[in-house]
């Protein structure tokens, strides 16, 4: 088993035989983990506002439009991209359409993977176990895919990737052969180097943006480890009914 990290979606190659865990810790995968814990009826991800509005116009039920551009909810949206806000929201039985600047694009880029999960600090142990168990059962490799920021490296995602790699490694039995790719080793190094996780996130580009728009409480919230045992999972033809499933409108 190969465990590796891609620090941007552009690094991803030949993923049809891999289990992919997408990370956009500030804040899309954190928000989506919370959203799915609230047991909505459907969660649909899109890459553009135009696609969001198109899907909404085609549905017979009134969906909740959720997400952000430049950190804030676009005009006419019901919610933004705040995991702390979603934690207090009543989403039971609702249809949610979600779009974000970086996270949903990264997720869309890996839909051909053997299986796709969403990871963050909030569900770290749960997503690590889910990915590891699937990889062992189906003889697949594990690739953590960082969304990055504006198609570039993001230290917050890399740090979270290192944390998730460490959680997977802790699960590996002594009789399981595995190796860490260069990206996974680098992510572990980043995770081990920084001791003040909140300070790291505050100094990151995405973190500074969240602070600038007045949502610094999101950083405190999303750093809570293992708050939620929900693992968002892509709905596919081979995986039509995951417990916490989402679909992607390409």
Feature locations, PLM:
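Phosphate/ribose-phosphate-bearing ligand recognition and processing surfaces
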Residues: 147-157
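Solvent-exposed alpha-helices and their adjacent loops that cap or buttress functional pockets
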Residues: 11-15, 36, 56-58, 87-91, ...
């Amino acid at each position: 088993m190969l465990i590796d990290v891609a620090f941007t979606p552009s690094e991803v190659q030949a993923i049809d035989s891999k289990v992919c865990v997408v990370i956009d810790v500030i804040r899309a995968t954190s928000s989506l983990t919370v959203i799915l814990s609230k047991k909505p009826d459907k969660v649909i991800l899109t890459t553009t506002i135009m696609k969001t509005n198109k899907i909404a116009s085609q549905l017979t039920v009134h969906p909740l439009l959720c997400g952000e551009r430049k950190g804030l909810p676009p005009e006419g949206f019901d919610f933004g991209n705040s995991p702390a806000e979603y934690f207090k929201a009543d989403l039971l039985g609702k249809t949610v359409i979600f779009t974000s600047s970086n996270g949903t694009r990264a997720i869309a880029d890996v839909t051909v993977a053997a299986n796709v999960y969403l990871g963050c600090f909030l569900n770290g142990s749960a997503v690590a176990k889910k990915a590891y168990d699937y990889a062992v059962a189906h003889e697949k490799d594990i690739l953590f895919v960082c969304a990055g920021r504006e198609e570039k490296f993001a230290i917050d995602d890399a740090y979270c990737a290192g944390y998730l790699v460490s959680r997977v490694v802790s699960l590996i039995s002594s009789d399981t052969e595995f190796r860490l790719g260069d990206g996974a080793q680098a992510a572990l190094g980043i995770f081990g180097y920084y001791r003040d996780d909140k300070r790291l996130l505050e100094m990151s580009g995405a973190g500074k943006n969240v602070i600038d728009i007045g949502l610094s409480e999101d950083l405190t919230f999303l750093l809570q480890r293992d708050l939620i045992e929900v693992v968002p999972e892509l709905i596919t033809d081979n995986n039509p009914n995951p417990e916490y499933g989402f679909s992607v409108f390409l």
